[in-house]
Every structure is written in structure tokens, then in C-alpha cells.
Amino acid sequence: MIFTQLIQTNLRTKELGKNIEYYNRLDSTNTEAWELIEEGNQHGTVIVTDNQTIGRGRMKNTWSMIPGKGVAFSLIIENCFPSNYSGLISLASGIAVVESLNKRGIETKLKWPNDVFANEKKLGGILSETKIIKDKIVKVVIGVGINVNETIAEHPKDIRDYMTTMLEISKHPHQRELIIAEFINSIEHLFHDISIDPKILINKWLNNCLHLDKIISFYENEIIVEGIFSGLDSNGFAKIEMNNEIKTFGSINLV
């Protein structure tokens, strides 16, 4: 069981995490977050579960969680950002996960735009969703899933070769509440970076990028193509060198 009081005891935030909604079981914490928004839940609310059964990822991907061992939570943000800041919000979420796990002794890297890797294998993922009204982002839901205290063998066979867990890396269990608390602490500070100077955020992300200046493969018009990941533009979009030309992509699926 996740103890919400332990999360709040370890918060150093001014706004985020003051209200935490815990559920034994949920289809998706992001889905529940949007339902709570419709019911009037406010900025900073955290939705956390011990058993997420239909975790959602980008491009209709799903997320496998082992009940009582992984981390699955969502954070509601109510703020007015320009509509082109969606990519920056996703970057901030990734950095917050890296900073949180670093405090637990787990060195991680980010695969654009939202995957968290350790030892070249997937450790976690992020799904950021926004509601835009009149060219302004007015609602944000950030969903985070991390493999924590399970073994690789507990996951489906078809993904075992490509994923890892904090337990497998460190050889000891981790307090899941502290991971969540540190993420919330980090993300509040990172949103301040967005409002002051997005370049600060972009540089932080690039410093933690798994594949900067490396050849990557991705789908373009349902065909796998290759290019060199050369950085990010001011909106957090990927800059990829293809045939000696830099192309910018706001949404692609890296292989």
C-alpha cells in the first residue's frame, strides 16, 4: 500500500501535492485525473494507485504494472501556458523523474520524448496530456509509471528483454512514497524554469538524453527511417539530421 501521509511529509512544495487521492486499483491514473478535474479538483492534486490495470502511453501504447510493487501516479496542473509549451511540459516531466531516481541512487537517461532508461533498458514512462482553450494550456495531467520493487521475471515475457526495474539495478527495495515525493518537489521547480527561461529546461533535458548526436530509428509515414538526433528546438521538438538537412518533429515514435 502507498501511504499518502509519507509522501506529504517529504514534500518541499508550495502548491503541489497538498491533496493526494489514493486508490487500491484503477484502470488509469490519467483517466481518473481528468474525471476529477470535471468534478472540480484543483491544481496540485495527485492521483496514485497500487494497481493500474490499463496504463496508457503515447500513441496507444500500454504500460505494464506489477500490483503493489511499481509506481503509477498522475499530477494535475492548472496553469496558463502558451499552447506551444506542450513539448516543454513533457520534457520537464522527464527531468523530474531523472532527478527523483538519482536521489535513490539510480542513474537514468531520457529517450525522447517520454521514456526513462537505465542500463540501456526501459525503466519508466511518462504521459503528459493537456487541455487547450484559446491558444492557452489551461489544464495539464502528467502521468508517471516506474518499475520499482518487482523482478523482471514478474513482467510479461515479450517485454523482459527490453525493460528493467529499480530492484534489479540496485539489488534492494525502494520506498515508493519517496520516489513520488521527490518527483513532485522537482516538477514544481522545473515549471518555474519554464516560466523564466525554457532554455534552462532544454539544456537540462539534453544533459540527460540517451541518444544525443547518435543515430536513431523512427517511424515516418509508417516507414522506419534513420537520422541523427541533433537536439531540441525552443518548443522541445526533436531536431533530427536526415540527408544533411535538419528536420523538426513534434511527435514521432522512436524504434
Please describe what each predicted stretch is.
Residues 24, 110-112:
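Short loop/edge segments at beta-strand edges and connector loops
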Residues 1-100:
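N-terminal lobe of the biotin/lipoate ligase/transferase fold
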Residues 2, 6, 15-16, 91-108, ...:
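Long, positively charged amphipathic alpha-helical accessory segments at protein N-termini or as interdomain linkers
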